[in-house]
């Protein structure tokens, strides 16, 4: 594959693009599920909740039942949202808050693809030619920053210190469903273009994702797109219709 033309900005998806889809589905989601009952029992409809933020988020759900029945109903509802991978902003806020506990305890470490780390470091070293990197995920911005702040050090050549890496300094901005909207809607990408001041030259923005519906929504706004082809990703029947990226070595 020949080198890409010079873009003025990169907009990147996370799961299935920057890290394995399995990390989200098999590690992050189960970690949250493990704690759902506890956070509901300790904070929902409690006069003195253990965590005010969680209590505020849980109160947004319209649960008619009272007492223990209400708590059980909310637990069931949250588990259904997770099972269906529902893009619910309140759920995403709760997940990020719970994951923070796992990141801080060392239970959660992010297996970012090595070529992604190489790209971020290489791009940062371009000086005045550095291309801004933005992240767009359904996960909350809080969760995004946690993810980039706890990248597993797996012996990459750029490793300078032991333990997890904080790569947030390589990221120029973050977008989620609260700040931009759903990733399958073109208006969301219009908001992002406006925010990063690229409305007049959308083709100079490259959006990479493993989801064809997201790519199509971005294309409607004139954004250049590429399909992330990572092992374990869901097969895209019309993958041939998109420029395919197996690694970030050409960015």
Curated annotation (Swiss-Prot):
Per the UniProt record, one Pfam family is Hydrolase
**What reactions does this protein catalyze?**
5-methylsulfanyl-2,3-dioxopentyl phosphate + H2O = 1,2-dihydroxy-5-(methylsulfanyl)pent-1-en-3-one + phosphate
Query: What's in the keyword line of the UniProt record?
Result: Amino-acid biosynthesis, Cytoplasm, Hydrolase, Magnesium, Metal-binding, Methionine biosynthesis, Nucleus
Which cofactors does this protein require? Mg(2+)
Which free-text remark accompanies the cofactor? Binds 1 Mg(2+) ion per subunit.
Can you list the GO cellular component terms from the UniProt entry?
A: cytosol; nucleus
UniProt-recorded Gene Ontology molecular function terms: acireductone synthase activity; magnesium ion binding
EC number(s) in its UniProt entry? 3.1.3.77
Disulphide bonds annotated for this chain are: none
According to its UniProt entry, one GO biological process term is: L-methionine salvage from methylthioadenosine
Binding residues annotated for substrate, in chain numbering: 137-138, 183
Q: Which domain of life is it from?
A: Eukaryota
**Which CDD domains does the protein's record reference?**
HAD_EP
Q: What is the uppermost EC class here?
A: hydrolase
Q: Which InterPro entries match?
A: Enolase-ppase_E1, ENOPH1_eukaryotes, HAD-like_sf, HAD_sf
Ligand binding (Mg(2+)): 13, 15, 210
- What does the UniProt entry say about where the protein is found? Cytoplasm; Nucleus
Quick one: which pathway? Amino-acid biosynthesis; L-methionine biosynthesis via salvage pathway; L-methionine from S-methyl-5-thio-alpha-D-ribose 1-phosphate: step 3/6; Amino-acid biosynthesis; L-methionine biosynthesis via salvage pathway; L-methionine from S-methyl-5-thio-alpha-D-ribose 1-phosphate: step 4/6
Family in the record: Belongs to the HAD-like hydrolase superfamily. MasA/MtnC family.
Q: How does it assemble?
A: Monomer.
- Matches recorded under HAMAP family: Salvage_MtnC_euk
Cited function: Bifunctional enzyme that catalyzes the enolization of 2,3-diketo-5-methylthiopentyl-1-phosphate (DK-MTP-1-P) into the intermediate 2-hydroxy-3-keto-5-methylthiopentenyl-1-phosphate (HK-MTPenyl-1-P), which is then dephosphorylated to form the acireductone 1,2-dihydroxy-3-keto-5-methylthiopentene (DHK-MTPene).
Which PANTHER family does this chain map to? ENOLASE-PHOSPHATASE E1
Q: What is this protein called?
A: Enolase-phosphatase E1
Give the originating organism.
Candida glabrata (strain ATCC 2001 / BCRC 20586 / JCM 3761 / NBRC 0622 / NRRL Y-65 / CBS 138) (Yeast)
What are the leading ranks of the lineage?
Eukaryota, Fungi, Dikarya, Ascomycota, Saccharomycotina
């Amino acid at each position: 594959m020949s080198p890409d033309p010079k873009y003025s900005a990169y907009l990147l998806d996370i799961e299935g693009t920057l890290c394995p889809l399995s990390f989200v589905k098999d590690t992050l989601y189960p970690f949250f599920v493990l704690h759902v009952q506890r956070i509901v029992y300790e904070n929902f409809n409690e006069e003195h909740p253990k965590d005010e933020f969680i209590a505020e988020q849980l109160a947004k759900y319209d649960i008619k039942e009272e007492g223990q029945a209400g708590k059980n109903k909310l637990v069931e509802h949250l588990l259904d949202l997770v099972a269906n991978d529902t893009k619910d902003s309140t759920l995403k806020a709760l997940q990020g808050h719970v994951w923070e506990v796992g990141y801080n305890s060392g239970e959660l470490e992010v297996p970012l693809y090595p070529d992604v780390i190489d790209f971020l470091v290489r791009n940062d070293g371009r000086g005045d030619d550095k291309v801004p990197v933005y992240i767009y995920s359904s996960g909350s911005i809080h969760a995004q920053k946690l993810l980039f702040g706890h990248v597993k050090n797996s012996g990459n050549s750029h490793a300078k210190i032991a333990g997890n890496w904080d790569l947030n300094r390589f990221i120029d901005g973050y977008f989620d469903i609260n700040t931009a909207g759903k990733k399958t809607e073109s208006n969301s990408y219009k908001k992002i273009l406006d925010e990063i001041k690229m409305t007049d030259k959308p083709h100079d923005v490259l959006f990479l994702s493993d989801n064809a519906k997201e790519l199509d929504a971005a294309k409607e706004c004139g954004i250049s797109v590429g399909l992330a082809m990572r092992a374990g990703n869901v097969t895209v029947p019309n993958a041939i219709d998109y420029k395919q990226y197996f690694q970030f070595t050409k960015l």
